């Protein structure tokens, strides 16, 4: 029975949820399914157990699982590979008399197959990894299914279980030397885990290994095995039916379903095992070496690729099987064409998640190379040993030294080449839980004969998986013959032949299986050999012999023999749907481990769920916490041993872990309750719906009967269910599980696993996804579509967005005319083979966003195809048959799931443009390097870690994009002579040495380069911003033709003059955000420089040589310390000059620059844009500014102007005078501004506005907010009225509290002068705090923003400032709610910023969000409660989700053609970012989406970030986007929007969602102001500057917001900005820092040494009397200066900035500096200690140069809990309290201090170590005294005057104590110390910030680990002598016992020891120490060697009765003798 559509009403409360749960359980339309997931899912869904007889015989073997094996399993942690029981396979038994032959298979293949393992020992057990999962899967499941076709019969056999056998001697040797342990399957899980961790090396394949077909021994072994038996044994080993070619029986196929394998199991397979390694290779027959009979010619896997798979989680190992008769088997027949076109079979052995869950996978036909195997003996050649080799572990000997590549040697006995490849360290990946995909099983496809016609004509079924399904199982076709079923199955598996079929067999030729992975070589054919010979050089790089060709064909990577590279991923024919929990192997970096989680919120639910577990894992060792300098080991053999700081490595680990955890979060289904019923809403074709209750295992075919009953459908016919996401619908397979699909889509939409997902299906979720129930009918076109089709031409066919399944019939008649075809956005589209073959002119094909998970097979038949676009799909592999598209020139595979490419790519000789961006490549797809005609490659947004050497073969490549990867090193590219552009942005590159001779454009933004040296002679543009670069130079050759150089956001402290001398052709130079104090004189050489930007540095002056830059047009110098112009600047022809935020004043009037400007100059005529905000200019500068006669834009905001009447500029269009001291505006002056469009006069002292402003007819922006306006608007003859300014778009009166707009009707003009509706263009009207007595105010609408509220909310003052920028529409909405929900302690502040708004009529969605959000939040708070913080956070989160649901519900209606108010079709690609601040009492909750940020500024100079930016380029956001099927291009999600979370964006769902990040803060007295702003503010201003401005205007948030806006515009912002400021406490007053000296309490100095300090409190006057004196010093500064002079210049500037900034905040006086040491005085102990603590914290958070953090004295150190306690420069501090002698320096006018007090303070500082604060006893006593006073105030409730004597002093101290308590402190008694130069010892106390208290423990441990003392040195000598005595006794020495125990020999007396130490230097002591240690090591080594060689240690004695004795007894006897001798001597 159908029901009407729901209205999507919300569930109200937990009680309602429980009722719905009960209804769901009771209303299930299907049978109750109480079976556990772990019991139900692993069973085959074919229901074949109900059938018997021939029906079972037609099917493949079905795998059954023991339900017990997983019934208690909830996560992967509980599944141990070694703890599994053997699993049997139930099958129909048909015994054969030949069964004993099959059982003898292991013994007959003993010499052939097990020899593979012997060979693997030579390659450091790497070949063992070639088995990959195969080895692992057979570890405990000793089974195989056998299907033999013998004598024309098709029979089935039971699985054969092979008994354990006793290993041979050779096998035993192999186990030892290959690193195998004797652990068996019965070992404990703990031992297995240790074994897993013990093997961490993955050896790449030796590319120069000779094929086994050349081995005479191989042929001999092959001949010894009878052909019949070999075929049967091969069937046993491979588990497939192998047919004799002479029988003539059609091949049949086993199609097991692919199952993801757990990574832990894979690692377990890596560990060599004595029983496992041999049996695995035996059971599965997988060739581990290139010398195997199946791997020599068309090897299914190379060593390197299998090694990669060994760490993967879901990859398929394939075996190419070819049947060649014994008479034709020879070493030459393997490559023959006849061998390639015999009847072929295929099998695909799949990895298993764990060893108890075998499953079958779909597979296609493949060929088998029948080259015999070789048996290679153990190599006895010497190898390189590591110094730390464990001699007791024989397996350790075979481990190759990673940096060493052992040269290949020839085995003369067998004629085979063996090589020991370079080792690559591959860390173990994270553990995973069991996914639903891993538990699902599929029935094997039925076997049938391959009929050629049906095979070529079969339909390719477009995969329906929206990357949301579990593993799919193939349903059993009904009513079809075996041949028909077989052919269809084969087509679904995309069988393609390696090349175009000949005429003879074009219809009857059976296409082979497409290449399943990058490592699977293509078929043998002449074209393949030719391309290999042509493109792949050998070791000499000049030719390629036949052996190299054969080796190349068996090696997917196609690398030359000299190449050793990290293996690429296997990409088998498996369905890795996104519900699989497995991860690709290459997700684990060869350099970076994947542990630690990122603080960024990729999925709050998962982070919260695992936070407890993460906290239990310490990052560093307990005994030694600091991290040494890390030497990166690149996969590329050219990678340098570059140093990287531990901080970066830890961050890499966090980023990598985030990726793994995020993928795990969405793909793990282990938390599902298999018995729980989930609600799902399914719609009918008439838009009615019904809600079903299903278990997770319920399939589509099980739901369809229930739906028929629900919808009362009695008609006959087939029905199906489609899934609609966005605008695309995909038909679900009968075996699909809708509940799992629904669940994952909900997670991708922002819901969490902890949410009630089981009842959410009751609601209308059609805005995200929609299940449609409909009959199976052909496509129906709308009239518009039919007209479009009829009108379309037949040459260029456009069939986009038509929901097609096949091309319309009409086009079949014109296929021969089609040249280009576009079928994009048709999710079910299939292009039949007939259509493709008949389109003989087809040149271009676009299949974008068809949501295919498989490569459309038939398109490889379009042999003339030139352009192919398949972006935005889920394609996991490219078939090898793509080689047939030899004419292909353009190939776009962007945004797929590719991990590798097939070897057939080498046939694409004409390929020129290749786009592989936004895929899953872990390793560079090296096969593309042999497409030598490539001109452009895009591999951005992958996870590539290194570039192989073979990249140099792309000699024609002009442009290469590798941005957003994980590259760490770029090596030599000198042979790529045509390379012009190289994009390497956003990688991890620390070193680059390309030597690219013709490279012109190089982009290196956001990498880790600290020193740039490269040879790029033709470089024209270099972008190297956001790198920790401290020096830059060019090796050997300088790029003289360079025109653009960008070095922004680096750490440069100077620019080498030689660099600028060589770059004489430079036109653009950017040096922003560095630490430059000057520019070199050589800048004058840049005579062609046009653009120069040195903003946000520390420049103290403009170099005079700058005046010689005659071509300079734009000069940006804002945010520096420049005080004056330079002579000669008047000769520059600048058009734009920005000197904002400098120290310019009136001094310019005194130099010649002013006089030269007065008489006319080039600058006065050329300058058009002059930005000079935030300086010290005043009215005396008007004559200078008037010289710029052509000035268009003048910005003089925040200067000292008080009168503009002297301004004579008439051509001005934009005038900014905000923040000055203007009180009036001259009418005559205004009349000169006839062209004025923008006038900013806010934050002045204006009382009235002249009437002449009405004459400014072009005025569009007028801001007079935050003034003191008080005038009568009706007096329009004398005061300004806006009636005549019709072009006004922005008008702001906010902040004028005395200004009144009163209704007044003028009879002269018969109009109301207060009417604001007369301004038709008005977009923003600010009337906050303005008195309104008129109704003539326009109503707010979608393109008009009105503010009329007061600037107080809940007693707290707030202010808003905004600007339209260059937009003509409203894009941001702010709203506040006072007394939210009627509660006095609640308020709500919201800021909604639009994205992708319509430029014509504004932004609709942001307005709707503003109007409805508060109501939604109220409902959610009522629903979830507000009793706890968690309840409120949940309500906030669901408020955004519900908001997004309602917004997209409206957009969904628009998309369906409904008429929705204020929304149009254009809004489907628009949305809004939101930041919500909810304050409840003292708790502040911040929730945000997108890039609007909120900052909490504190009065102690600190701040707290409350929000997180959701950008698509952030790795955690990017991973989520990719999992959901989206992509990122140019920093935008799907190329549309630059945020990853937002409300709206209907067309981007589920790639974008609305789950917010939420933070909670408990407000304290230190919290001063809240700043919420759109993203443009943070782009142009740093957070410190924002907080400084907010702190400066803490009492007036409206002025603070306005000043922030004005500064952003002065710094270059031209876009819209909205800023909201909230002062958190009522009656906040600006208070100065006080001292105990009354004279200094009220006075402040006003000199500014740095413009960054200008906004802070002025420096205090020097304190006198009792004061706190602090000395600071940098630890190891001399060493660092000598080691890194350039880096230390940058580091010292950072250090000084922190010191001086904190001094201003806490009120200290800088006495003087000596080098890097500071001497500082404070008037109170509390202020001094607070400053010390805060400086230590700031130093820890500073950005230090890479060189500083790469050494031990500056590296990152973490404590046991993982908290960083040291990083960067380490500063020691000493503080003392006393009364020094003040003395004023007459020259510097600085106060100095003298006397014993100063000396003692300096000595106390000398006691401290780096990071410590040493306090004298006097200071400690004074501090305790003040704290007792504070305790009396707090606990005793005494008044400040009673406690402190004076109230003002008490206020100061109490405020400082509050700051101190907000930081926290920890004191440790350091004991008494003798201070240098002082008589008495001083009791010293060490202080730390509270969060750094663990520093003390580290310092104590570090102190104990320092150099040994004298006593320890001589003790070591005693040990050495005693060990040598033992050696002498063992060797039969003649030294008597009494001589050996004499004190003079064994031990010096104290007198001798003192004499030695006094006579030697420190260097001699170190040499003595080294000598003693060497002696000890030698003795120990000799003793160990003797112990190993003999059964014991024999003491040689002179008497003949000496007996053999153990070494331990000998030692005991010797010690007893020594003791007895001592007793006798005493």
Curated annotation (Swiss-Prot):
Highest taxon of source: Eukaryota
InterPro entries: A/G_cyclase (IPR001054), Adenylate_cyclase_G-a-bd (IPR013716), CYAA_C (IPR048580), Leu-rich_rpt (IPR001611), Leu-rich_rpt_typical-subtyp (IPR003591), LRR_dom_sf (IPR032675), LRR_R13L4/SHOC2-like (IPR055414), Nucleotide_cyclase (IPR029787)
Amino acid composition bias (Basic and acidic residues), ranges on this chain: 32-43, 93-102, 329-350
Needed cofactors: Mg(2+)
Domain PPM-type phosphatase: 1357-1624
Ranges where the Guanylate cyclase domain occurs: 1668-1805
Basic residues bias locations: 44-58, 471-485
Pfam families tied to this protein: Ad_cyc_g-alpha, CYAA_C, Guanylate_cyc, LRR_14, LRR_8, PP2C, RA_3
Modified residues (Phosphoserine): 433, 487, 497, 562
Positions where N-acetylserine occurs in the chain: 2
Family that this chain belongs to: Belongs to the adenylyl cyclase class-3 family.
Positions of modified residues (Phosphothreonine): 376, 389
Listed name of the protein: Adenylate cyclase
Bias-annotated ranges (Polar residues): 1-14, 59-81, 135-146, 214-223, 261-274, 301-328, 405-421, 449-462
SMART domains documented for this protein: Ad_cyc_g-alpha, CYCc, LRR_BAC, LRR_SD22, LRR_TYP, PP2Cc, RA
Catalytic activity, reaction form: ATP = 3',5'-cyclic AMP + diphosphate
Cited PROSITE patterns: GUANYLATE_CYCLASE_2 (PS50125), LRR (PS51450), PPM_2 (PS51746), RA (PS50200)
Biased composition (Low complexity): 282-300, 575-601
Signal peptide annotation: none
SUPFAM superfamilies: L domain-like, Nucleotide cyclase, PP2C-like
Record's keyword terms, sorted: Acetylation, ATP-binding, cAMP biosynthesis, Leucine-rich repeat, Lyase, Magnesium, Metal-binding, Nucleotide-binding, Phosphoprotein, Repeat
EC number per UniProt: 4.6.1.1
CC terms in the record's Gene Ontology section: cytoplasm; cytosol; endoplasmic reticulum membrane; mitochondrion; plasma membrane
One GO MF term: adenylate cyclase activity
Cofactor annotation comment: Binds 1 Mg(2+) ion per subunit.
Top EC class, one word: lyase
């Amino acid at each position: 029975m159908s029901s009407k559509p729901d209205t999507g009403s919300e569930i109200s409360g937990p009680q309602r949820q429980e009722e719905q749960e009960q209804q769901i359980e009771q209303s299930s339309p299907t049978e109750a399914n109480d079976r556990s997931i772990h019991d139900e899912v692993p069973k085959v869904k074919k229901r074949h157990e109900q059938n018997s007889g021939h029906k079972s015989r037609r099917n493949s073997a079905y795998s059954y699982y023991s339900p017990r094996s997983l019934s208690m399993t909830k996560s992967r942690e509980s599944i141990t590979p070694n703890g599994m029981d053997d699993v049997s396979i139930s099958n129909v038994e048909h015994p054969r008399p030949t069964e004993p032959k099959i059982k003898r298979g292991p013994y007959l293949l003993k010499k052939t197959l097990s020899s593979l393992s012997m060979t693997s020992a030579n390659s450091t057990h790497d070949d063992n990894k070639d088995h990959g999962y195969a080895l692992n899967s057979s570890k405990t499941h000793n089974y195989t299914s056998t299907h033999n076709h013998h004598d024309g019969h098709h029979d089935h056999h039971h699985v054969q279980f092979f008994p354990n056998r006793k290993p041979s001697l050779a096998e035993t040797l192999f186990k030892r030397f290959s690193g195998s342990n004797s652990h068996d399957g019965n070992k404990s899980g703990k031992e297995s885990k240790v074994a897993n961790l013990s093997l961490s090396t993955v050896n790449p394949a030796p590319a120069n290994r000779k094929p086994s077909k050349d081995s005479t021994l191989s042929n001999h072994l092959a001949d010894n095995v009878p052909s019949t038996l070999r075929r049967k044994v091969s069937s046993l080993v491979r588990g497939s039916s192998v047919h004799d070619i002479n029988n003539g029986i059609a091949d049949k196929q086993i199609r097991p379903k692919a199952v993801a394998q757990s990574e832990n199991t894979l690692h377990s397979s890596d560990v060599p095992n004595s029983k496992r390694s041999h049996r695995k290779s035996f059971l599965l027959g997988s060739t581990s070496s290139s010398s195997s009979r199946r791997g020599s010619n068309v090897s299914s896997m190379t060593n390197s690729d299998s090694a990669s798979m060994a760490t993967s989680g879901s990859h398929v190992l394939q075996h190419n099987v070819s049947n060649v008769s014994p008479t034709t088997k020879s070493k030459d027949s393997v490559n023959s064409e006849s061998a390639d076109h015999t009847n072929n079979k295929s099998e695909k052995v799949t990895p298993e998640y764990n060893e108890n869950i075998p499953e079958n996978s779909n597979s296609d036909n493949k060929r088998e190379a029948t080259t015999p195997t070789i048996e290679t003996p153990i190599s006895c050649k010497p190898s390189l040993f590591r110094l730390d080799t464990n001699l007791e572990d024989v397996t350790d000997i075979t481990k190759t030294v990673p940096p060493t590549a052992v040269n290949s040697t020839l085995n003369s006995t067998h004629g085979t080449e063996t090589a020991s490849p370079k080792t690559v360290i591959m860390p173990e990946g994270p553990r995973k839980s069991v996914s639903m995909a891993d538990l699902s099983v599929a029935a094997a496809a039925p076997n049938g004969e391959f009929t050629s016609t049906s095979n070529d004509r079969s339909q390719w079924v477009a995969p329906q998986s929206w990357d949301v399904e579990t593993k799919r199982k193939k349903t059993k076709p009904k009513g079809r013959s075996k041949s028909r079923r077989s052919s269809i199955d084969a087509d679904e598996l995309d069988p393609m032949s390696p090349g175009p079929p000949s005429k003879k067999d074009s219809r009857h030729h059976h296409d082979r299986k497409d290449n399943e992975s990058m490592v699977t070589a293509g078929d043998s054919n002449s074209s393949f050999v030719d391309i290999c010979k042509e493109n792949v050089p050998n070791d000499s790089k000049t030719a390629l012999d036949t052996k190299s060709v054969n080796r190349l064909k068996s090696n997917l990577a196609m690398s030359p023999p000299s190449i050793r590279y990290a293996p690429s991923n296997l990409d088998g024919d498996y369905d890795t749907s996104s519900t699989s929990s497995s991860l690709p192997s290459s997700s684990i970096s060869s350099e970076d481990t994947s542990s630690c989680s990122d603080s960024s919120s990729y999925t709050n639910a998962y982070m919260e769920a695992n936070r407890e577990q993460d906290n239990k894992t310490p990052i560093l060792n307990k005994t030694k916490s600091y991290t040494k300098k890390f030497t990166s080991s690149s996969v590329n053999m050219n990678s340098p041993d570059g140093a990287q700081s531990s901080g970066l490595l830890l961050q890499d680990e966090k980023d990598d872990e985030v990726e793994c955890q995020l993928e795990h979060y969405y793909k793990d289904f282990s938390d599902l309750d298999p018995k729980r019923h989930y609600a799902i809403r399914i719609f009918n074709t008439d838009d009615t719906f019904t809600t079903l209750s299903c278990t997770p295992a319920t399939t589509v075919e099980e739901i369809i009967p229930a739906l028929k009953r629900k919808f009362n459908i009695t008609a006959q016919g087939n029905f199906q269910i489609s899934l609609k996401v966005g605008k695309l619908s995909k038909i679900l397979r009968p075996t699909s599980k809708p509940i799992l699909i629904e669940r994952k889509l909900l997670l991708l939409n922002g819901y969490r696993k902890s949410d009630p997902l089981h009842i959410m299906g009751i609601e209308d979720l059609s805005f995200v996804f929609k299940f449609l129930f409909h009959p199976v009918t052909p496509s129906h076109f709308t009239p518009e579509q039919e007209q479009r089709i009829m009108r379309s031409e037949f040459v260029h066919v456009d069939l986009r967005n038509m929901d097609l399944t096949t091309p319309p019939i009409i086009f079949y008649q014109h296929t021969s005319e089609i040249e280009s075809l576009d079928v994009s956005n048709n999710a079910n589209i299939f292009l039949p083979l007939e259509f493709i073959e008949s389109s003989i002119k087809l040149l271009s094909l676009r299949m974008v966003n068809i949501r295919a998970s498989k490569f459309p097979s038939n398109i490889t038949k379009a042999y003339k195809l030139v352009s192919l676009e398949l972006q935005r799909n889920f394609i996991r592999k490219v078939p090898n048959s793509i080689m047939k598209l030899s004419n292909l020139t353009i190939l776009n595979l962007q945004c797929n799931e590719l991990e590798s490419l097939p070897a057939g790519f080498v046939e694409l000789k004409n390929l020129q443009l290749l786009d592989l961006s936004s895929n899953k490549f872990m390793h560079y797809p090296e096969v593309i390097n042999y497409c030598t005609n490539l001109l452009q490659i895009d591999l951005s947004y992958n996870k590539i870690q290194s570039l192989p050497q073979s990249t140099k073969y792309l000699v024609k490549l002009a442009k290469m994009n590798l941005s957003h990867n994980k590259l760490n090193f770029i090596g030599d590219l000198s042979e790529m002579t045509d390379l012009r552009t190289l994009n390497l942005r956003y990688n991890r590159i620390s070193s680059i040495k390309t030597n690219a001779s013709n490279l012109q454009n190089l982009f290196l933004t956001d990498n880790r380069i600290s020193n740039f040296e490269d040879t790029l002679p033709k470089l024209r543009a270099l972008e190297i911003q956001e790198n920790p670069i401290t020096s830059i130079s060019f090796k050997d050759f300088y790029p003289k033709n360079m025109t653009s150089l960008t070095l922004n956001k680096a750490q440069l402290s100077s620019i080498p003059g030689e660099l600028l001398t060589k770059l004489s052709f430079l036109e653009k130079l950017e040096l922003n955000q560095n630490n430059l104090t000057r520019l070199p004189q050589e800048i004058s050489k840049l005579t062609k420089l046009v653009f120069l930007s040195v903003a946000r540095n520390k420049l103290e002056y403009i170099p005079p040589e700058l005046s010689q830059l005659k071509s300079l047009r734009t000069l940006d110098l804002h945010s520096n310390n420049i005080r004056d112009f330079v002579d000669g600047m008047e000769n520059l022809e600048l058009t734009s000059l920005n000197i904002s935020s400098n120290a310019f004043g009136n001094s310019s009037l005194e130099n010649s620059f002013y006089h030269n400007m007065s008489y006319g100059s080039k600058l006065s005529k050329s300058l058009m844009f002059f930005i000079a905000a935030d300086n010290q200019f005043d009215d005396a500068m008007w004559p200078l500014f008037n010289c710029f006669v052509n000035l268009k834009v003048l910005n003089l905001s925040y200067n000292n102007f008080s009168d503009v009447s002297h301004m004579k500029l008439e051509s001005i269009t934009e005038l900014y005078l905000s923040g000055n001291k203007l009180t009036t505006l001259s009418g005559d002056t205004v009349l000169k501004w006839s062209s004025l469009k923008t006038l900013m006069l806010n934050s002045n002292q204006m009382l009235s506005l002249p009437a002449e402003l009405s004459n400014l007819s072009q005025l569009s922006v007028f801001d007079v907010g935050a003034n003191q306006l008080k005038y009568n608007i009706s007096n329009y003859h004398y005061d300004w009225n806006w009636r005549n300014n019709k072009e006004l778009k922005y008008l702001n009166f906010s902040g004028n509290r005395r200004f009144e707009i009163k209704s007044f009707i003028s009879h002269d003009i018969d109009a109301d002068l207060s009417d604001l509706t007369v301004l038709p263009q008005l977009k923003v009207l600010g009337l906050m705090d303005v008195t309104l007595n008129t109704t003539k105010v326009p109503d707010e609408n979608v393109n008009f923003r009105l503010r009329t509220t007061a600037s107080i909310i809940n007693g707290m003052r707030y202010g808003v400032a905004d600007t339209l920028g260059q937009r003509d529409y409203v894009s941001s909405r702010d709203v506040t709610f006072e007394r939210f929900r009627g509660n006095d302690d609640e308020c709500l502040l919201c800021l909604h910023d639009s994205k992708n708004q319509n430029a014509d009529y504004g932004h609709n969605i942001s307005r709707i969000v503003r109007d409805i959000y508060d109501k939604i939040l109220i409902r959610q708070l009522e629903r979830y409660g507000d009793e706890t913080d968690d309840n409120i956070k949940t309500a906030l989160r669901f408020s955004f989700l519900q908001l997004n649901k309602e917004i997209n519900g409206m957009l969904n209606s628009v998309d369906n053609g409904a008429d929705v108010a204020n929304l149009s079709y254009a809004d489907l690609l628009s949305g809004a970012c939101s930041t919500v601040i909810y304050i409840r009492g003292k708790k502040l909750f911040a929730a945000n989406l997108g890039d609007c940020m909120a900052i909490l500024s504190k009065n102690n100079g600190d701040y707290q970030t409350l929000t997180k930016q959701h950008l698509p380029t952030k790795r955690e956001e990017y991973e989520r986007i990719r999992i959901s099927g989206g992509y990122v291009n140019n920093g935008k999600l799907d190329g549309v929007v630059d945020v990853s979370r937002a409300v709206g964006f209907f067309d981007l769902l589920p790639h974008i969602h609305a789950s917010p990040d939420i933070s909670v803060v408990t407000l304290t007295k230190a919290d001063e102001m809240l700043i919420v702003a759109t993203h443009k503010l943070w782009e142009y201003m740093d957070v410190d500057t924002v907080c400084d401005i907010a702190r400066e205007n803490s009492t007036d948030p409206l002025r603070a917001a306005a000043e922030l806006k004005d500064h952003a515009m002065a710094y270059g912002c031209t876009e819209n900005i909205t800023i909201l400021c909230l002062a958190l406490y009522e009656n906040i007053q600006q208070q100065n820092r006080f001292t105990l000296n009354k004279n200094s309490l009220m006075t402040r100095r006003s000199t500014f040494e740095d413009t960054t300090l200008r906004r802070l409190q002025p420096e205090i006057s020097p304190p006198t009397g009792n004061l706190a004196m602090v000395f600071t010093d940098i630890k190891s500064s001399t060493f660092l200066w000598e080691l890194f002079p350039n880096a230390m210049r940058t580091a010292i500037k950072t250090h000084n900035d922190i010191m001086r900034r904190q001094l201003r905040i806490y009120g200290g006086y800088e006495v003087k500096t000596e080098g890097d040491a500071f001497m500082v005085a404070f008037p109170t102990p509390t202020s001094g200690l607070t400053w010390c603590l805060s400086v230590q914290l700031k130093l820890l958070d500073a950005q230090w140069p890479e060189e500083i953090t790469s050494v031990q004295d500056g590296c990152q150190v973490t404590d046991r809990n993982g908290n960083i306690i040291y990083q960067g420069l380490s500063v020691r501090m000493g503080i003392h309290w006393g009364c020094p002698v003040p003395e004023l320096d007459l020259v510097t006018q600085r106060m100095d201090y003298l006397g014993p007090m100063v000396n003692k303070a300096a000595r106390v500082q000398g006691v401290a170590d780096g990071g410590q604060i040493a306090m004298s006893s006097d200071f400690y006593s004074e501090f305790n005294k003040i704290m007792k006073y504070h305790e009396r105030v707090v606990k005793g409730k005494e008044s400040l005057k009673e406690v402190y004597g004076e109230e003002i002093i008490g206020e100061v101290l109490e405020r400082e104590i509050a700051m101190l308590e907000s930081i926290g402190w920890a004191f440790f008694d350091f004991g008494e110390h003798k201070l240098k130069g002082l008589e008495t010892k001083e009791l010293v106390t060490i202080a730390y910030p509270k969060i750094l208290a663990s520093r003390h423990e580290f310092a104590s441990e570090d102190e104990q680990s320092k150099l040994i003392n004298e006593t320890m040195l001589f003790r070591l000598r005693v040990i050495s002598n005693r060990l040598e005595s033992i050696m002498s006794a063992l060797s039969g020495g003649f030294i008597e016992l009494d001589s050996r125990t004499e004190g003079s020999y064994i031990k010096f007396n104290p007198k001798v020891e003192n004499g030695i130490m006094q006579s030697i230097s420190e260097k001699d002591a170190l040499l003595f120490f080294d000598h003693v240690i060497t002696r000890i090591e030698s003795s120990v080594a000799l003793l160990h060697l003797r112990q190993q060689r003999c059964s014991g240690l024999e003491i040689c004695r002179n008497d003949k009765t000496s007996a053999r004795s153990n070494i331990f007894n000998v030692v005991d006897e010797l010690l007893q003798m020594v003791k007895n001798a001592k007793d006798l001597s005493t």
